[in-house]
Amino acid sequence: MYTVVRRYQGVVDATEVVRRAIDEFAPQVRAQPGFPGYWVVDAGDGVVATITAFDSEDAAVESNAASATWVQENVPNLVPNPPRVTAGETTGVMAEIPA
């Protein structure tokens, strides 16, 4: 598994960005092959982070490009700065997702 963390700073309206990411962008990510998970975090103080997991690095790179395009086309006034991206092979997982 390959995981990508995108950290956006200077977000103007985090609540709106999170809502739109879940409603509009998440379905696009979910439709990509090899997709096991997508999380959006409102970290406060104008910081929003997303965590995306894929079965392969290629799928993650494709998702990164799709994310950049979606932000530029849909919320450029709310997310004025490019994200700091951290990505790599997932070396350990423990998850318990409530229903």
Please report, for each region that a protein language model flagged, where it lies by residue.
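Short S/T/G/P-rich N-terminal loop/turn motif that feeds into the first structured element of a domain
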Residues: 1-49, 55-69, 76-99
